[in-house]
Amino acid sequence: MSSIIKMFNPKSIALIGATEREGSVGQAIMKNLMMGKDKRSIYPINPKRDVVMGLKCFAHIKDVPEHVDLAIIATPSNTVPSLVEECGLANVDGVVIISAGFREIGEEGAKLED
């Protein structure tokens, strides 16, 4: 299956930045993933948590026990470059970044975006 198909129909999803913190982006995405009716594996990633919404939480994407089709990164912009690199090293097929603090905040954010 091609990487683009896996992005739109992933069998396994890792949410980097998963949390139960009320009002956070990581919580909102996690809730939406958990409400999905299709059968796919969901892996919360957060080095500060052991469990998120009843699922075992992993410290890093490399710790996930199966191949990840899609990683969603919902963390501050300064963490994104190293997390994308970790996803590449873990052979993740696709990455979606949901973050702020890039070009819209000025020159420093633009450097991160590039």
Where are these regions (language model features)?
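Catalytic-core regions of core metabolic enzymes
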Residues: 1-114
